[in-house]
């Protein structure tokens, strides 16, 4: 990797990272791990102090409070991302080659893998000023990638339309490395991400919908706290009375609230008000707020299981696995854009579950993604057999590259699903954006790069 440039642009003053090598910088990294694992509200200063084998009071000598530790953690990651994306090439003044940018961003993300998902899910807990600073950095990084994509598309005589959404998808893919613990080497991760980036760069932008280069979403999944009524569930929460305050109505209202404000900021009274009942009526169905969260997560897990079971029943063992995989992706995109808050909650609030429920949910998520990966491997193997039969070694080489092994297939599944969900979140789950992000995800699962 080309060494980062030394004249890095400083991030906004409100989000300056601690000086490298300082005690405060060390605290920031440990805090990032804890906030990523537990969530902002569930993390206590004692958790961070315990990891550093010191007392909380010792931390306060370097950092004033918990929020400042959180902000330092986010600033450290954001600054590293900005540095990784800056122009490091010595050839001319144009944008650096796409592969160079993606490699640099991937290696930086890999070095922070245990904490890379921090501001993907926890950014809503930043102050508005700090959140805006994160978005500014994110926009600059995305713009640099989009410039490199346009260069690549012009080299292949392609219309540059869709470069912005392709760049957003690339960042989602790289960020997804922080969402799993699939066994990969750093070089394997870099090879996979650069291969995906080249595929996405040449993905036709005709399905862009509302995802123009100016408004193509937030690839790192930063929560803005704003959603359309359809996406937030505000218009779909039933106004229930008395005995009609059913379990499903309460869960629907809770999902909308948890999505907008975060689990810890929501009260049973607020959920009850959304469905037109007193909080006491909700306690007839749920012993407390945590039970509502568990029920909401379980409902989404069931939604995924039903999707996979129905799909498996429809596609028998003799079906073309590539066709089956595309069909499954199409169904997932439909669910993601119609149940966006449900899916966001399913991935972002596990830290608020009990240890037992959290483990159970993570195991369910792993099983679900493994079913995707099995189908992807079958599709890739079938493609290899087909290309061998036609005697096209160049195509075969591309199909097998970083695509057939189980671990890399699982990583591709994580990346593809992240592109759909991040794209939906960044466009407030606007229906017109579904086709574009589904198209990009399809290029991740089944590469379409010309030979």
Which ranges hold each PLM region?
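Amphipathic alpha-helical packing segments from all-alpha helical-bundle domains
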Residues: 128-154, 356-384, 388-391, 397, ...
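Conserved small-residue-rich
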Residues: 171, 235-304
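Ordered, small/hydrophobic-rich secondary-structure cores
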Residues: 21, 29-32, 36-42, 50-186
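Amphipathic alpha-helical segments used for helix-helix packing
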Residues: 109-131, 336-356, 414-421
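Helix-turn-helix
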Residues: 26, 30, 34-70, 261-291, ...
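Generic hydrophobic, amphipathic alpha-helix propensity
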Residues: 23-31, 48, 73-77, 81, ...
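Hydrophobic/aromatic-rich alpha-helical bundle segments in the mid-to-C-terminal region
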Residues: 153-227, 231-239, 362, 381-444, ...
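Hydrophobic alpha-helical connector segments
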Residues: 86-113, 309-341
């Amino acid at each position: 990797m080309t060494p980062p440039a030394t004249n890095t642009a400083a991030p906004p003053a409100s989000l300056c990272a601690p000086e490298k090598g300082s005690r405060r910088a060390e605290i920031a990294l440990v805090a990032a791990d804890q906030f990523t694992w537990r969530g902002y509200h569930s993390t206590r200063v004692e958790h961070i102090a315990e990891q550093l084998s010191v007392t909380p009071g010792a931390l306060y000598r370097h950092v004033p409070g918990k929020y400042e530790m959180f902000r330092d953690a986010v600033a450290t990651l954001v600054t590293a991302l900005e540095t990784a994306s800056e122009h490091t090439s010595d050839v001319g003044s144009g944008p650096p080659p796409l592969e160079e940018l993606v490699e640099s961003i991937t290696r930086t993300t890999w070095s922070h893998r245990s904490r890379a998902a921090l501001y993907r899910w926890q950014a809503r807990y930043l102050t508005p000023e700090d959140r805006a600073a994160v978005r500014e950095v994110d926009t600059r990084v995305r713009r640099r990638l989009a410039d490199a994509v346009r260069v690549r598309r012009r080299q292949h005589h392609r219309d540059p339309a869709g470069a912005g959404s392709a760049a957003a998808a690339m960042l989602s893919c790289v960020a997804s490395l922080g969402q799993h613990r699939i066994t990969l080497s750093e070089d394997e991760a870099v090879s996979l991400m650069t291969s995906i980036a080249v595929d996405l760069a040449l993905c036709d932008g005709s399905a862009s919908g509302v995802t123009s280069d100016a408004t193509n979403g937030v690839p790192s999944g930063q929560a803005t706290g704003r959603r359309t009524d359809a996406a937030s569930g505000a218009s779909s929460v039933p106004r229930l009375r008395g005995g009609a305050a059913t379990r499903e109505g309460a869960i629907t209202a809770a999902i909308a609230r948890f999505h907008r404000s975060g689990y810890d900021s929501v009260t049973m009274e607020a959920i009850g008000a959304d469905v037109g009942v007193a909080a006491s009526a909700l306690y007839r169905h749920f012993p407390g707020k945590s039970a509502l969260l568990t029920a909401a997560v379980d409902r989404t897990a069931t939604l995924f299981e039903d999707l996979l079971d129905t799909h498996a029943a429809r596609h028998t063992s003799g079906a073309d696995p590539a066709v089956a995989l595309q069909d499954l992706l199409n169904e997932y995109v439909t669910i993601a854009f119609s149940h966006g808050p449900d899916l966001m909650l399913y991935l972002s609030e596990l830290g608020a579950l009990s240890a037992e429920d959290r483990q159970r949910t993570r195991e369910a998520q792993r099983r679900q993604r493994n079913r995707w990966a099995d189908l992807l491997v079958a599709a890739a193997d079938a493609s290899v057999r087909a290309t061998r039969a036609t005697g096209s070694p160049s195509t075969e080489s591309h199909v097998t590259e970083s695509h057939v092994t189980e671990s890399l297939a699982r990583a591709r599944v994580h990346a593809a699903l992240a592109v759909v969900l991040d794209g939906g979140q960044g466009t407030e789950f606007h229906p017109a954006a579904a086709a574009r992000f589904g198209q990009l995800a399809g290029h991740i699962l089944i590469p379409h790069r010309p030979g």
